[in-house]
A protein has these predicted regions:
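Conserved N-terminal entry element of GNAT/NAT acetyltransferase domains
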Residues: 1-8, 131-137
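Acetyl-CoA-dependent GNAT
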Residues: 6-53, 63-64
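A short, internal acetyl-CoA/4′-phosphopantetheine-binding micro-motif in the GNAT/acyltransferase core
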Residues: 57-66, 92
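Conserved acetyl-CoA pyrophosphate-binding loop and the N-cap/start of the following alpha-helix
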Residues: 66-74
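Conserved GNAT acetyl-CoA-binding A-motif
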Residues: 80-91
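Conserved catalytic-core motifs of GNAT/GCN5-like acyltransferases
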Residues: 90, 108-123
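Conserved active-site alpha-helix within GNAT-family acetyltransferase domains
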Residues: 94-111
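C-terminal "cap" of GNAT-fold acetyltransferases
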Residues: 116-137
């Protein structure tokens, strides 16, 4: 059984930080954790909220928690609670699993930051609310 942790963002962030790449801005963030048998197995970290956009990073050590109901929950948080019109992600070009996941969720490749992950490029992905297949219209 998976338990969603929404009220302990600092513990979730401490678990996720060593597993994340890039220059994440931790000043204002939200983090949801996913526990199995009392151990964190996944986290979704939201940073760089601008009102219209929010950056998302996903960390997992066990994909058992990645189900439709949790995906829908995350999109509802971004688009309904935060009121964003888009969601963004930045991924190392060598992270094929994350790229496949983002494309499967409906994200579109929007650009490339050359040598962002020294020496690898960063690929910028985005998704508009109007493109989101996970929310009811």
């Amino acid at each position: 059984m998976i338990e969603v942790i929404t009220d302990d963002k600092h513990r979730v962030a401490e678990w996720a930080k060593p597993k994340l790449e890039g220059n994440i801005q931790w000043a204002n963030f939200q983090a949801f954790g996913f526990e199995r048998h009392g151990d964190l197995v996944g986290a979704v970290v939201f940073t760089e909220y601008t009102g219209n956009d929010i950056h998302v990073s996903v960390v997992t050590t066990d994909p058992c928690w990645w189900h439709r109901r949790y995906i829908k929950l995350l999109y509802e948080y971004v688009f309904d609670q935060c009121g964003c019109i888009r969601i963004s992600a930045l991924v190392n070009e060598s992270n094929r699993k994350s790229i496949k996941l983002l494309r499967g969720l409906g994200f579109k490749e929007e650009g490339r930051l050359r040598s962002y992950f020294n020496p690898k490029d960063g690929i910028v992905f985005g998704q508009l609310r109007s493109e989101c297949k996970w929310l009811e219209r």
